[in-house]
């Protein structure tokens, strides 16, 4: 089964053994970060460093002309993508460019009007608002530029839609604020100026909606169905505008380049895998495939099956398996997880993450990639 692994460019750049180590696992594809959120990561095998800390940014040299007049522009973290790509391709490994789109602390902090503002008025600087025209333009320019990166064979878009409340950083102390069930979704609903305009256009009073959302989040009263319908409709429309603009920009910049979107069939999903109807997302002019977060073996098969049922025939459905024990994965069961995902309708696999994996995790990835029989 077609299997690729995630990597960061700093896992490869400066480590002459990295590409051979990845190829030695039996992997022939790597999804390599070209635009990523702020991160602190281990680099267990690198000869220069063990812990890498990076702010949100891009890992290639942008074209200044491409960004002329843009309200939002990415910062360059380090231009290591090109060298990492060349090293991997030299070892016979194809490279997919991996972009994180609406999860960006730097831009959300600098341009708070483009970040999510919850029903209480709190701004989430890590979460760019999918309903913002400036964010749509930023996302489209980013994806179009990345589509032209030399040496890549495909593009993967993470967080290409609604981000939200959940965000593991900043010494997080929010574990008790979001009740189970709809709590995280309620805290993810945006009431920035753009979203308020969208609710108003749908015939609702934004202030009234915000009061209802606050009451529901505080456990005072359930959110009325009519209010939920307005919110769901406006948010779905905004997400589709963003994804549609991004995909159109990629098609114009690099016709024929395969594009996969990290998504979830639950329309209220937010975060790295935001909610989209697979039938729409991969319909005419849409993405070539969906990447699913199958990190929980208990729910993974159902997630894949629901997506496969809703997606158009021929859609690529990639199941991402968590291969790192230190991140909560179960590497010993990777082969069984892969079999279950395939039986449910997955057409290919991703393993997260070959750069973060310890030697035991890498051994499990190697076993997974062994030819059957």
Question: What is each of the regions a protein language model found here?
Answer:
Residues 4-12, 61-79, 122-137, 228-238, ...:
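The substrate-binding groove and active-site-proximal loops of carbohydrate-active enzymes
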Residues 16-47, 145-154, 279-291, 343-348:
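Catalytic domains of carbohydrate-active enzymes, especially glycoside hydrolases
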Residues 11-24, 133-146, 269-285, 302-304, ...:
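Short, acidic/polar
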Residues 27, 31-76:
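Aromatic-lined carbohydrate-binding/catalytic grooves of carbohydrate-active enzymes
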Residues 122-253, 258-283:
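Polysaccharide-binding and catalytic clefts of secreted carbohydrate-active enzymes
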Residues 6, 96-147:
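Active-site-adjacent "subsite" loops/lids of carbohydrate-active enzymes
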């Amino acid at each position: 089964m077609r299997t690729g692994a995630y990597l960061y460019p700093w896992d490869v750049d400066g480590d002459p053994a990295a590409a051979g180590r990845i190829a030695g696992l039996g992997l022939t594809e790597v999804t390599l970060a070209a635009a990523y959120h702020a991160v602190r990561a281990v680099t267990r095998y690198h000869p220069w460093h063990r812990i890498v800390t990076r702010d949100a940014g891009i890992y290639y040299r942008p074209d200044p002309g491409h960004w002329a007049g843009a309200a939002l522009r990415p910062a360059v973290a380090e231009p290591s993508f090109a060298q990492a790509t060349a090293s991997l391709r030299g070892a016979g490994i194809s490279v997919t460019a991996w972009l994180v789109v609406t999860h960006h602390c730097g831009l959300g902090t600098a341009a708070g009007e483009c970040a999510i503002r919850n029903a209480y008025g709190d701004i989430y600087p890590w979460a760019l608002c999918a309903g913002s025209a400036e964010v749509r333009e930023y996302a489209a320019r980013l994806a179009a530029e990345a589509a032209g990166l030399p040496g890549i064979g495909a593009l993967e878009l993470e967080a290409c839609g609604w981000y939200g409340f959940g965000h593991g950083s900043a010494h997080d102390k929010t574990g008790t604020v979001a009740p189970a069930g709809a709590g995280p979704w309620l805290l993810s609903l945006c009431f920035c100026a753009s979203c308020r305009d969208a609710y108003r256009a749908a015939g609702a009073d934004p202030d009234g909606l915000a009061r209802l959302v606050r009451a529901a989040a505080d456990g005072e009263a359930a959110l009325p169905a009519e209010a939920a319908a307005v919110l769901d409709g406006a948010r779905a429309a905004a997400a589709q505008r963003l994804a549609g603009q991004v995909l159109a920009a990629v098609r114009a910049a690099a016709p024929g380049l395969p594009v996969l979107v990290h998504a979830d069939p639950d329309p209220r999903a937010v975060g790295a895998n935001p909610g989209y109807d697979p039938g729409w997302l991969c319909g005419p002019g849409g993405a070539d495939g969906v990447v699913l977060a199958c990190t929980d073996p208990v729910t993974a098969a159902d997630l894949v099956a629901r997506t496969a049922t809703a997606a158009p025939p021929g859609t690529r459905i990639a199941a991402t398996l968590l291969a790192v024990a230190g991140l909560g994965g179960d590497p010993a069961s990777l082969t069984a997880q892969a079999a279950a995902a395939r039986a449910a309708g997955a057409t290919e696999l991703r393993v997260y993450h070959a750069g973060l994996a310890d030697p035991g995790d890498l051994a499990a990835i190697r076993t997974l990639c062994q030819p059957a029989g």
